[in-house]
Amino acid sequence: MRKFSLLLTLLHVCIFFAAGQAKTRRLPGIINHPSINVQAPYISHDGNALLFVSDMGEDGALTVAYTSRENDWVEPVELPKTINNRSVFLKGFALSADGKRMYFTSAKAPVVGGYDILSSELKGKTWTEPQNLFMPVNSKANEGCPSPTADGKSLYFMRCDNMNYRTASGCKLFRVDKKPNGQWNEPKELPGNINTGNSQSPRIMADSETLIFASDKIPGGKGGMDLYVTRLVNGDWSNPTPLDFVNSELDDQFVTASALGRYLIKETTGARNKMELVEYLIPDDLRPKGMMKVEGSVTDENAAAVPAYITITDLTNGKRVYSGRPAADGSYFVYVREGTRYEFSVDPEQSKLSYFTKLFDLTSEKIPQREKISVVLKQPSPGDEILLNGIQFQPFTAQLDASSDREVKKLVRMMKANPEMIFEIQVLLEGYEEDSLQSSNDLTEMRMDSITTVIEEIDSLGQAFKRDTVLVKTFYHNDRTQKQAEAITNQLVTAGINSDNLKTLTNAIAAIVPGDRKLIIKAVPRLK
């Protein structure tokens, strides 16, 4: 029995290891039902909504289904007849980054040309009446297979000489950008190294610089329509590279990926010779840059929306990568790219209100898919703790980093707008260390402890006497909190804050988790 148990344990470990290294992952059975075919997937960038074509319709008719998830995928449902009818280009559906807006291709009147691009918005559980994008997006030709960027400000699509319910030919790829007023500019044709005669089904990845498309007019394919990837580098699209890890002798055309960019979802033949949806691990050299979704709300104490500005700054170069406002209900979402560190900031229109800052480090091997941040902006009250996440010090010093200037300016604005308060600058170190030797670069501070002892000795006449001896012990430590607090208050005074309105509080304790060092900086308002 013991040998059998050991064998089972080893078998379990081997299976787990193999699964961890798997290059393919089949979507769950609620989507890949064994009795139906599923094809042409399109997943929202946040990974929580999915469209696909299946023969789950009446009498096995092809239809477009929608599913979503908070944790697990829910039972797919057919799209309403206002969208899902014989007038559509069956595999030309797409979703916005949050899955709340759908773009699709239809020949249902009124249209500008043959097939046009339309959109519909999800309100609760109902899709709104489709709206034609009209000119200049649509033309007298056939437009289809739209693919929006993560920020919704651009749309990639194909314009074709011929199109019907199932197929298209003679296609070129275009990009169209939105004006500040929400209207569309004139579409621009992608360059000749992409448009070689019949390029179709563009899929712009969440990083907005990686484009996957299909073509049967680029040399070196495996047969039929093959998939290619091109990247936008310094304003130019690279020469397309075939996706050999998924291309086959058959038509390979409709694929999709979430913002993390690790896996590509594609239809393939599965059990019982039915088409199913499978995730394929994208090789590192072909993988788009992963994107993390930051979402949440900006409200007051009563959960009402507050007029505010959201900015995201790349801390590597100091450049602002995003600037915008929350929606009318206070909600927001934005995507940030892996590979650098960011400062996320929410600033109110009213100077007397608090503000919010948080730092993101997306330089590690794995990044989270989502960060949810709900911000409450309010007038400071005595005892409130306002985290000063944007204040950073140069390594192993009490010298403020230049990136701290933004946080200091915001703090000065708020303090000047609340003159009835004094503000206590708190600097708290979790991760205090000391040693009798300067054993690391972090141990920049020195403390001397003196110990007085009484020693009895015999003098030259043989008489006993006592004398005091002082022993001095030197310790090196990393508690720079008082110097750091003073550096902050000095900067505030230089910016015009009266020193009488400032206090400091510092403390240093050992790390709660060994090796987990944290420096927490706060501003706490107090009544005068």
PLM-predicted stretches and their roles:
Residues Q21-S297, E301:
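Short, conserved micro-motifs composed of acidic
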Residues M1-K23:
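Bacterial Sec-dependent N-terminal signal peptides
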Residues E267-V278, K378-P382, M421, D435-K528:
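Periplasmic OmpA/Pal-like peptidoglycan-binding modules at the C-termini of bacterial envelope proteins
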Residues M205, M291, K366-E385:
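Conserved "repeat-terminator" motif of extracellular CCP/Sushi domains
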Residues G224, E301-N317, S403:
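Short, ordered, surface-exposed loop/turn motifs in non-cytosolic proteins
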Residues L315-S331:
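Short, acidic Ser/Thr/Gly-rich low-complexity loop/linker segments typical of extracellular
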Residues E349-S374:
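Structured interaction patches on ligand/partner-binding surfaces of diverse proteins
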Residues G330, T340-S351:
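A short, solvent-exposed beta-strand micro-motif common in secreted/extracellular proteins
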